[in-house]
UniProtKB/Swiss-Prot annotation:
Residues 143-375 form the Radical SAM core domain. Catalyzes the methylthiolation of N6-(dimethylallyl)adenosine (i(6)A), leading to the formation of 2-methylthio-N6-(dimethylallyl)adenosine (ms(2)i(6)A) at position 37 in tRNAs that read codons beginning with uridine. Its EC number is 2.8.4.3. Binds 2 [4Fe-4S] clusters. One cluster is coordinated with 3 cysteines and an exchangeable S-adenosyl-L-methionine. Belongs to the methylthiotransferase family. MiaB subfamily. Its main location: cytoplasm. InterPro entries: Elp3/MiaA/NifB-like_rSAM, Methylthiotransferase, Methylthiotransferase_CS, Methylthiotransferase_N, Methylthiotransferase_N_sf, MiaB_methiolase, rSAM, rSAM_horseshoe. It comes from Escherichia coli O1:K1 / APEC. This is tRNA-2-methylthio-N(6)-dimethylallyladenosine synthase.
Length: 474
């Protein structure tokens, strides 16, 4: 009888990536098949996120529902992973003694051994350590699920922003070697992946080891990924302004595979609040990065993160944030009301902004961003956009759906053979959450490259020094 696994995932794209790796790992080692129905499962895993408010209570509410399933089936294994597991550890079992496994983001690769241990002597297992890069060394080969894929290139963060739990739950920055990343992406490309999204809590801080023992930069890695045959689009998330260096901006100038869309969190437009947040950059420095980016790639669109109602935020501070939003003309944002995370420095600050004021500021900010996003969408009306076709439309099974470079969903009439390929679509209608278009060119008519070697990418990104000597630093 087939053994079944149910994974419930909350949080960021890194958590989604981790959950997919858990599923692949337990399929390879134990033959577990994924199910969307918790009642069918032999193993239940909850991959948690500590970013949102009341994250811990949300976990225990979910575990309470699963407790009823365990009472009916004592052999059921329940595991809790992710960032809340890292924060709470043994405390989870103190409140929910029926939980069998507690593991952190850096120990998910040990799940097979943990399950074997529980199956063997029924003793619970808690492992929330930080074994650095070992996690990636023990994961199964990647498996493509459509034309887009996420690839984690690093873990953790060294920035210690005062509101953020990531350094405490995922540890400090650890970069994967470049060869491991490139091999994983090449495997995905061979399975039909056309677009790859490089993941990291602070992805542009990547400093991985190269094959020759040298340390590579994120800009180097982007160019090498662009050289992989079949990869026609590259995205990455999430970046930090302090490490968005000029060499990364140069990649936007000479590497068309890198999309004209960037998510670059800023959090606030007030230097005073940025200082309290420990962001180590100013609003002016952030805008300088955007100016350089738009000089290199004039059509680039920017999204960001914002926190409103941070302790001490005044009306003047908030107005500075609104000015930054107008100056940069953000295309979209992830915006939140501040809520303290236990164990962070901001949790000890006086939360002196009234709740109603926080809600009002969030509403004003989101309305402005929505207006700007709609204005960006309207500019696309009548233009031709290249779409990576992901599958059938959610709105109609008779239509296809895909995404533009700037992450807009486009629905259009097409044929099944277009799925997984690029099409050029003329935008005919603009809606608040999507666009509509008609196909004007198929991939066969585009003349996309058939193959390109790393050497050819290096050749076309060749620079010359003051003496006229060409160079490229891999």
């Amino acid at each position: 009888m087939t053994k079944k696994l149910h994974i419930k995932t909350w949080g960021c794209q890194m958590n989604e990536y981790d959950s997919s790796k858990m599923a692949d790992l337990l399929d390879a080692t134990h033959g577990y098949q994924l199910t969307d129905v918790a009642e069918e499962a032999d193993v239940l895993l909850l991959n948690t996120c500590s970013i949102r408010e009341k994250a811990q209570e949300k976990v225990f509410h979910q575990l309470g529902r699963w407790k009823l399933l365990k009472e009916k089936n004592p052999d059921l294994i329940i595991g809790v992973g992710g960032c809340v597991a890292s924060q709470e550890g043994e405390h989870i079992r103190q409140r929910a003694h029926y939980v069998d496994i507690i593991f952190g983001p850096q120990t998910l690769h040990r799940l097979p051994e943990m399950i074997n241990s529980v199956r063997g002597d029924r003793s619970p297992v808690v492992d929330i350590s930080f074994p650095e890069i070992e996690k990636f060394d023990r994961l199964p080969e990647p498996r493509a699920e459509g034309p887009t894929a996420f690839v984690s290139i690093m873990e953790g963060c060294n920035k210690y922003c005062t509101y953020c739990v990531v350094p405490y739950t995922r540890g400090e920055e650890v970069s994967r070697p470049s060869d491991d990343i490139l091999f994983e992406i090449a495997q995905l490309a061979a399975q039909g992946v056309r677009e790859v999204n490089l993941l990291g809590q602070n992805v542009n801080a990547w400093r991985g080891e190269n094959y020759d023992g040298t340390t590579g930069s994120f800009a180097d890695l982007l160019r090498l990924v662009a050289a992989i045959d079949g990869i026609d689009r590259i995205r990455f998330t999430t970046s930090h302004p302090i490490e968005f260096t000029d060499d990364i901006i140069e990649v936007y100038r000479d590497t068309p595979e890198l999309v004209s869309f960037l998510h670059l969190p800023v959090q606030s437009g007030s230097d005073r609040i940025l200082n309290l947040m420990g962001r180590t950059h100013t609003a002016l420095e952030y805008k300088a990065i955007i100016r350089k980016l738009r000089a290199a790639r004039p059509d680039i669109q920017i999204s960001s993160d914002f926190i409103v109602g941070f302790p001490g935020e005044t009306t003047d501070d908030f107005e500075k944030t609104m000015k930054l939003i107008a100056d940069v003309n953000f295309d979209m944002s992830y915006s939140f009301i501040f809520s303290a995370r236990p164990g962070t420095p901001a949790a000890d600050m006086v939360d002196d902004v009234p709740e109603e004021e926080k809600k009002q500021r969030l509403y004003i900010l989101q309305e402005r961003i929505n207006q700007q996003a709609m204005a960006w969408s309207r500019r696309m009306l009548g233009t031709t956009q290249r779409i990576l076709v992901e599958g059938t439309s959610r709105k109609s099974i008779m239509e296809l759906s895909g995404r533009t470079e700037n992450n807009r969903v486009v629905n259009f009439e097409g044929t099944p053979d277009m799925i997984g390929k690029f099409v050029d679509v003329e935008i005919t209608d603009v809606y608040p959450n999507s666009l509509r278009g008609k196909v004007v060119r198929t991939e066969d008519e585009m003349g996309l490259r058939v193959a390109e070697t790393p050497e050819s990418v290096i050749a076309r990104t060749r620079k010359e020094n003051d003496l006229g000597v060409g160079y490229y630093q891999p």
